[in-house]
Amino acid sequence: MVDIIIPVYNALDTLELAVTSALMQGDVRILLVDDGSTDGTARLCDELAHHPRIAVIHQQNRGVSAARNAGLQAAASEWLTFLDADDVLLPDAIGNLLALAGDSQAIQGLVTRSEAPDVPECTVQTLPSRDMLDLALRNPTVHLHTHGWLLRREICNERFNESLRLGEDGEWMMRVLRGTKTVARAQVNAYCYHLRADSAVHSAADVVREYLRTLTAAQPTLNYLDMPDAAAQYRLMHLLLMLTHGVVQEGGFRDGLRQCGAIRRLCREAFRADLRRVRWLPRSKAQAVLLMLRCGLYPLARRAILIRRRQNQQACVSAESAI
């Protein structure tokens, strides 16, 4: 059996779809953790819990990390996975991942933004945990999150850091993967992530401060892993997140000057050593922006990030209109 942990907060419009996708997975138990919802979601959770395979936990509002921790505490099956209340598991995701997991302690499926994605050739790659961690640190937005992961409960003794607000799932996944021996990566469509505009309003200062707090919390694990190049890439990808979701905003000439000044200070004060590791021949758009930052081309980097922000916002609008 697999426990599916669903942290829930004010998800009245989306929860039933998420739960339906979970029930279709077969031999599963669903743990709904209501984090102090105020819109009728708590009552809906109680109604859904009449199903024999659904249990509900109610708690005061303490944030998604506390809700996930409550789910971890209640989990009792050999395997577990997480599902956000506004996303869905794709058909046969759990069964396909279990069939490919073998002796691995964790397996990652594909995350899509479509409920009817192209079907890839079903293959699996098994990696030593250190190789997987190297890959994950270099690509944290792809690998260091809870979406699409199926985990043996025996490796999930770590708890989410409830003081973190941004990037907390990646910091937790890094600690969990540290305790594995082998990890599998499967070419299996597993999880549909419904891209939405963030309902929480964060100021630029809040975004920078919260991501820096996450990096501080992650540093002991990074020190333990002793992967300096991969750790630098992990931190630099968080720098790009800070800039994209916090510092860089639309605005006029004076706004641009002020933002470029903030970018320069952040790069010089917190990321100078990491930027020195950036390759001179970038292999991706993200690496190209990091090279601009290394070279002090802050206006050019800001422009590239603005383009990326506009693409993200358009994707959010398209996703919302499709629902």
Task: Identify the residue ranges that each predicted region occupies.
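Short, acidic, metal-binding catalytic loop of nucleotide-sugar glycosyltransferases
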Residues: 20-29
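Glycine-rich, basic loop-to-helix element that forms the pyrophosphate-binding segment
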Residues: 59-75
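Conserved nucleotide-sugar donor-binding catalytic segment
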Residues: 132-206
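Catalytic core of nucleotide-sugar-dependent glycosyltransferases
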Residues: 189-197, 202-230, 249-271
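Membrane-interface aromatic/basic loop that binds lipid-linked glycans or pyrophosphate carriers
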Residues: 249-323
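Conserved donor NDP-sugar-binding/catalytic core segment of glycosyltransferases
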Residues: 92-121
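Short aromatic/hydrophobic "clamp" motif used to bind/position activated sugar donors
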Residues: 80
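A conserved acidic beta->alpha catalytic loop
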Residues: 21, 34-43, 60
